[in-house]
């Protein structure tokens, strides 16, 4: 059971773990940037990536679709940048694990489980392994 109260707590734990592994991590303050820009810019092993974070209360296991509360413009931004060759993803933290979602346009913010769109991790340690 993951105990992050909110997205800020999840972000703090994730950024701390990433930096401990030697990643460059920059938190993006979205109030000062364009519409849709993700929460984190990360460089690991010379590879840049953009990561949108979500904290969703409830469980992700045994669901055919995941409902992700992207704000207007977020999916489009991630998909546009991914199409230019930069890795983009959403990390959705649920009570029972973290789901990595590849960038794409998902109808009504619903992501099908499996089919290569998602990957499940039990915690931050397994995500970064």
Language model feature labels by segment:
Residues 79-108:
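Nucleic-acid nuclease catalytic cores
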Residues 40-42, 48-58:
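Conserved catalytic cores of phosphodiester-cleaving nucleases, focusing on short active-site segments
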Residues 1-31, 84:
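Acidic-basic catalytic patches of nuclease active cores, encompassing PD-(D/E)XK
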Residues 26, 51, 89-91:
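Hydrophobic/aromatic beta-strand patches that form the interior of the parallel beta-sheet core
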Residues 36:
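Beta-rich catalytic cores
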Residues 57-81:
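Mg2+/Mn2+-dependent nuclease catalytic core
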Residues 99-129:
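Intrinsically disordered, low-complexity terminal regions enriched in charged/polar residues
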